[in-house]
Amino acid sequence: MDGLLAYMYTMMAECRAQGRVLKRDFLVQCGRSMELFPGVREWFARINAFGERLGVEVEHYVLSSGLKEIIEGSGIAHEFKQIYACEFYYDESGLAAWPKLDVNFTNKTQFVYRINKGILDIARDKELNDSMPDDSKRVPFTNMVYVGD
């Protein structure tokens, strides 16, 4: 089993075993308590201003094997054009029912291509896989800076 799907499944199973509910709101709330390193909040405005001085529009994205709901709760979520991360599917009562998306080491490449081609919607797989001339791509790879951990 994929390790990320396993940890997401285990989160659901452990919550059930402990009589806890795993809902989106709970995970978003976890993100609100996330501590950021000094300077992280200010970094976005600084790099955006630097890009503007050079005539470059800067966009920020997250490609993470963490949980999207937690990242969305963080104090910097609004800085990102798109957040690609693991996320749950929720049933009609709002409970996490199954892993909806996992973003692992290998498929992070897919999300870099989404940014490259400007196809940010994860439901548009066919278009993502269609051939596209380089001069039609929204963000050339040469214009990307990828910072990883």
Task: Please tell me what each predicted stretch does.
Residues 31-61, 65-149:
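C-terminal cap/substrate-recognition subdomain and adjoining C-terminal extension
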Residues 1-52:
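A metal-dependent, Asp-based hydrolase signature
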